[in-house]
Amino acid sequence: MKPNIIFVLSLLLILEKQAAVMGQKGGSKGRLPSEFSQFPHGQKGQHYSGQKGKQQTESKGSFSIQYTYHVDANDHDQSRKSQQYDLNALHKTTKSQRHLGGSQQLLHNKQEGRDHDKSKGHFHRVVIHHKGGKAHRGTQNPSQDQGNSPSGKGISSQYSNTEERLWVHGLSKEQTSVSGAQKGRKQGGSQSSYVLQTEELVANKQQRETKNSHQNKGHYQNVVEVREEHSSKVQTSLCPAHQDKLQHGSKDIFSTQDELLVYNKNQHQTKNLNQDQQHGRKANKISYQSSSTEERRLHYGENGVQKDVSQSSIYSQTEEKAQGKSQKQITIPSQEQEHSQKANKISYQSSSTEERRLHYGENGVQKDVSQRSIYSQTEKLVAGKSQIQAPNPKQEPWHGENAKGESGQSTNREQDLLSHEQKGRHQHGSHGGLDIVIIEQEDDSDRHLAQHLNNDRNPLFT
């Protein structure tokens, strides 16, 4: 509540100074702070000299605004003193604006710029935490930052200088481009006691902002957070590597966290999730290599996967690992069955069914115990932490001629489920959650389920 009151008082003081400029435009350049002691009475001069020492000591601690006038019942002297006081503060204000490299138009149009930003839907929150005591490392007297050498300056003028610096930083950073705002910060407030943090992070600037924010949290106590919520600027806050890994889900909205550490943690979690998804997709991709028809259908459904392969070197390594595992999955069942054509169809269907269950039913209950250790190795490569044992291909419900008749329906349904799961994981990957789908085998409802998934696939491509 106290910072809000101080902020309102500072705005009123600035408006009063602007009114004084409009009335007396040419008298501010010739006045010096030493003219305050030239009062007609000795009592007033002694009081002001004592007030100067008090103001010097309080400039290092908390800010305060004091208007103390021990003047006799002479209205002319009192009005003269107040005018000199305001003109001196205005003189220091113009010097501070020249030192910052900004034009005086920023100060005059400050209220107009705030209204313009509010009309665009930008929300600003300014939190000022200031504690008493000596200034920390990097904290200086605000009047000394502006290049003012004479001592004995009023606390109200120091506070107005600080507020003007704060608003010049905040508004120029929001109204002008990023390069202009960075130039203004380097000239004026690189060592000031205020740290401005905004969430309009550009991709080539994010590492520097992160480093500066961690240093400022350790060195400063006066923190001013100016946050701007805008959907287009939030989407540009992604790293280039993060955009490459999540380009397939570019329609997702990534909510920027309050803490940069939490944001980096979510990046690593999403990265690991996408690596697991790529393991599963590559393992399922190459397990269907024994049929040219399945390769054609799979190539239709994995155009997005090929983009991810061209953008990252991790995907090519995953493809090599998954290729070795999937070839073993196809050749080992075909060697154990001792029947040439019919056995190859059964082994292909069983391996594809196991791949589907390993990819979807990671936490499903499967009571069948596999006699091949290569399936558990592939399942560890896909999921990383799951402990599911794949079912035995000999116990699968495809035998004899039924396997020949149902192979086309099962592969079509598996392909539909594969594309459905890939799109679902791309959409929900930013939230850090895994979609777990347990699918039971029913011979009567195979065609109905495949048709239903084909109907559900269409909204995912939009």
From Swiss-Prot:
GO annotation, cellular component aspect: extracellular exosome; extracellular region; extracellular space; nucleus; protein-containing complex
Region spans: Repeat-rich region: 70-439
Keyword Metal-binding: no
Record region (Disordered): 24-61, 131-157, 173-194, 270-432
Family of the protein in this entry: Belongs to the semenogelin family.
Transmembrane segments: none
Name listed for the protein in its UniProt record: Semenogelin-1
PTMs per UniProt: Transglutaminase substrate.
Domain of life: Eukaryota
Gene: SEMG1
